[in-house]
Design a protein with these regions (language model features):
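Generic structural signal for well-ordered alpha-helices
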Residues: 28-32, 63-67, 96-106, 129, ...
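Gly/Pro-rich turn-and-neighbor structural signature
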Residues: 108, 113, 122-159
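Short His-Asn-centered micro-motif
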Residues: 118-122, 142-143, 170-172, 213-214
Length: 435
């Protein structure tokens, strides 16, 4: 039986130096060194752009090793969105541009053009299928295990279709993902984990198995990188890569893969979509609405923006979806990173002549617009609910003082004498007039 073995990391944009170094020392170096020393081994690989950039700046020798393995045909790198954006959260015309930008970065730095696509945190939406072929890619790699239903959609490669466009999907073998998640959640020991992996790897199946292991979940346990050696030792030299497999096999099976958050990268509870996760959290929805407003402002003000390339780069960083996921949303470093680039966008746009940012905009989807007041020393979004400051930006520090509060600044509350219940001023809309 042939198998595809892969490794992926999704350390969010804005992660700390310590996290990058732990990933490198405990996972990347042992894994890449093992593949380099055995020319018969092949590995499917995914890192985020921010991770590649960190390696380029701090450990260029690692990127050189990755480049060498790509040229030898031992490593196939997956493309993805730029700076960890969930593709379904951005406009349709920007999805292809995001993928192509990542693909170009990988091609220029690692000598090979990616052929496959990875979805950040395995958030899949059928509407992104057309972007695969438009980006010149051949296949998608994603789990089809749905945490809500507890069911796995498919175990063999298949074609999925949307709007007349097809994309080939290599579904992950969820057994390995489950064992890795259990180790991460301390539901099993390293010894038992490696034993279970060895047992599964010894089983023969008639169809190809696609195994992708989450390095972020493994890096917390020292010695867990041995799992790759276990799989290679048991399953031998039958490992292949999707590109090679497609050149030797014809896929005829079709299956419609519905939208959802797949795999076991994080616990989603009863959530059925990324949109639900965002709209149920005031801070997330405000950030999402803000980024959408900034994107539309940039689009409508092309002729007024002198350095459009720099503006687009900042907007991509501000659009990072890493903030929205439970495992990362409590990380202050992620908050600061996402917040900084949003603030930088607002400062740059506010300094353009004729003030291109709309004076009223609904950034939190409550159907009541906020009023924007921009000055030299601060930029303020004044909510009509209780005159709360939804955002209070200090341009010199590129920070929003209200960002860490779900209610905004000055969301005062008091005890109602008649009902003895707490009431918030933010619950009542107020009319805002100019002085």
């Amino acid at each position: 039986m042939e198998y595809i073995l892969g490794a992926y990391s999704q350390l969010p944009f804005g992660s700390s130096r310590e996290e990058y170094e732990t990933l490198l020392s405990r996972q990347l170096k042992p894994l890449l060194t093992m593949v380099y020393r055995n020319s018969s081994l092949k590995l499917l690989f995914r890192l985020g752009i921010s991770e590649f950039e960190y390696l380029e700046q701090n450990h260029p020798e690692v990127n050189m090793l990755i480049n060498d393995l790509c040229r030898k045909g031992q490593l196939e790198i997956l493309s993805s969105s730029y700076y960890d954006v969930v593709l379904s959260l951005i406009p349709t015309h920007e999805r292809t541009a995001q993928i192509e930008k990542t693909t170009t970065y990988i091609r220029k730095n690692f000598s090979r053009k990616p052929r496959g696509l990875w979805f950040y945190n395995q958030v899949f939406n059928p509407t992104t299928v057309p972007a695969v072929s438009l980006s010149g890619l051949d296949y998608i790699v994603v789990s089809t295990y749905n945490q809500v239903s507890g069911m796995t959609e498919a175990t063999r490669p298949f074609y999925t279709e949307e709007m007349g466009k097809q994309a080939l999907v290599f579904p992950l073998d969820d057994r390995y993902s489950k064992e890795t998640a259990d180790l991460y959640n301390s539901s099993t020991t390293l010894e038992k984990y490696l034993s279970n992996i060895r047992k599964m790897a010894s089983e023969n199946t008639s169809s190809i198995s696609t195994i992708m292991l989450n390095l972020d979940q493994l890096m917390g346990t020292e010695g867990s990188s041995d799992v790759f050696k276990v799989i290679f030792d048991v399953m031998g030299n039958r490992c292949t890569l999707p590109g090679i497999y497609l050149s030797e096999n014809e896929i005829a099976r079709t299956h419609y893969l519905p939208g959802g958050i797949y795999g076991r990268d994080f616990r989603i509870g009863k959530l059925t979509s990324i949109n639900q996760l965002i709209y149920e959290n005031p801070k997330f929805s405000r950030n999402y609405g803000l980024v959408n407003m900034l994107r539309e402002t940039v689009r409508d003000s092309k002729r007024l923006i002198e350095d459009r390339k720099n503006m687009d780069q900042i907007l991509m960083k501000a659009s990072s979806s890493s903030l929205y996921f439970p495992d990362e949303c409590g990380n202050p470093a992620i908050h600061r990173s996402v917040n900084r680039y949003s603030c930088e966008m607002e400062v740059l746009l506010s300094r353009i002549s004729n003030m291109v940012i709309p004076e009223e905009t609904d950034i939190d989807f409550d159907r009541i617009p906020e009023s924007l007041i921009a000055g030299k020393s601060n930029i303020t979004y004044l909510s009509h609910r209780g005159a709360v400051l939804s955002r209070y930006i200090i341009p010199s520090a590129l920070t929003d003082l209200a960002f860490h509060s779900g209610d905004g600044l000055f969301a005062d509350s008091f005890i109602n004498d008649k009902t003895s219940k707490e009431m918030k001023l933010a619950a009542k809309p107020y009319e805002v007039t100019s002085l």
